[in-house]
């Protein structure tokens, strides 16, 4: 049995990240999703035995295969939590632990993943919160809980883990909390994302960032 598998759920590439549509075209957003996924998988490959990507979108699965990931076609009439359950069933009996991460956290490489995985050998449940009360990483045994990835999922996951007596351990990380949804998030990538595929792509798009004293902390523009 392997030590740990990563699970990455991806819905689609096309017409995604619509909150960025005033700033990036549909094709640009599609490419952004691909390079962010590449950053996530490049980091995880250093630390996990296999990376499992689950999606119902054939284009996503084909791209995942080009990255040498294990791919699972998501069942019909599914949702994110059902998809994760399907992926965890695949992992159960193959890996002692699983690490669930989203595909849009390109700064994951700045987090000490090795430390978290080492800690997971003696801890039952590790969780990393995202901005706005969500969840951007869980490390646990496959199917240790049924995930609750909707709304304020961080508190829900902690409550469920406590009810299961898993003694959840919280790891706060600015870089892991940064899932990309807004232009200001792109600015953070430009500041902190040195040597990432995502920052390189944003530079190709001539994305610029500077400090700002208005309603947003950063002013993000294209030249």
Each language-model region and where it sits:
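Active-site acidic Asp-centered loop
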Residues: 101-103
């Amino acid at each position: 049995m392997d030590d740990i598998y990563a699970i990455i759920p991806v819905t689609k590439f096309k017409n995604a990240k619509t909150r960025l549509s005033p700033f990036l075209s549909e094709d640009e957003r599609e490419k952004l999703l691909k390079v962010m996924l590449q950053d996530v998988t490049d980091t995880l490959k250093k630390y996990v035995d296999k990376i499992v990507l689950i999606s119902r979108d054939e284009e996503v699965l084909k791209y995942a295969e080009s990255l040498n990931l294990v791919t699972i076609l998501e069942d019909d009439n599914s949702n994110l939590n059902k998809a994760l359950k399907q992926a965890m069933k695949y992992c159960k009996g193959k890996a002692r632990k699983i690490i669930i991460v989203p595909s849009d956290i390109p700064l994951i490489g700045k987090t000490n993943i090795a430390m978290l995985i080492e800690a997971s050998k003696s801890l039952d449940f590790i969780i990393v919160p995202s901005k706005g009360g969500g969840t951007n990483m869980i490390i646990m045994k496959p199917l240790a809980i049924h995930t609750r990835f909707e709304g304020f999922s961080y508190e829900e996951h902690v409550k469920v883990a406590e009810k299961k007596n898993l003694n959840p351990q919280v790891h706060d990380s600015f870089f892991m909390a940064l899932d990309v949804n807004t232009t200001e998030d792109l600015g953070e990538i430009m500041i902190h994302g040195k040597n990432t595929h995502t920052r390189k792509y944003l530079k190709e798009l001539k994305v610029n960032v500077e400090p700002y004293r208005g309603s947003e902390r950063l002013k993000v523009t294209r030249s």
